[in-house]
Amino acid sequence: MHDFQFRAKGDKRLKAFSLQDLKKSHTVNIKWRFQKNNDNGQVITYVIDNINKQHCVVEACKRIYKRAISLKIPQDRPIAVFTQEKMGRNKTSYINDIHIKNLLQEAAKNEYNIHCKKELSAFTSHSIRVGACVLLHTQNISPEDIKFRLRWRSDTFRTYLRNNLQLAEKHRDAIANA
């Protein structure tokens, strides 16, 4: 639970483990314990999105935090957990890359009607970071900011950039306005 630090407006620290204070959260600082780039312990700040709460990192962190408290997860343990029923009993498990891969592949089947195993194999836990990279690129975020915010040490993120509908529309509009 120490990997999330919630703050109110004005960067005021909130009391740790207070569900009442959690409602005042304006930002969350997330400590990334282990990273592929070995920049372990890096802290990144996320700001609440009051317009699009469904995709708000702060709101997601609040749900994760509340779930960890309700499941009595020890404070020194990872809090990305879920419960599932196995043999008539609820079992708490840590969310791992296999769970994420399975959820993303199921979403790809349901949302995009993808059923080819080879195509589905492209949907992995890394897809979230790649998708964020592509989305930021389509929104004209600078390569330096993409690299910094998504924790890339090299320029390999550029290999993930794709042609997509948003870029095709910008290309069309640029030609139309030329």
Question: Where are the regions that the model predicts?
Answer:
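Extended, non-catalytic subsegments within catalytic or DNA/protein-binding/adaptor domains
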Residues: 1-178
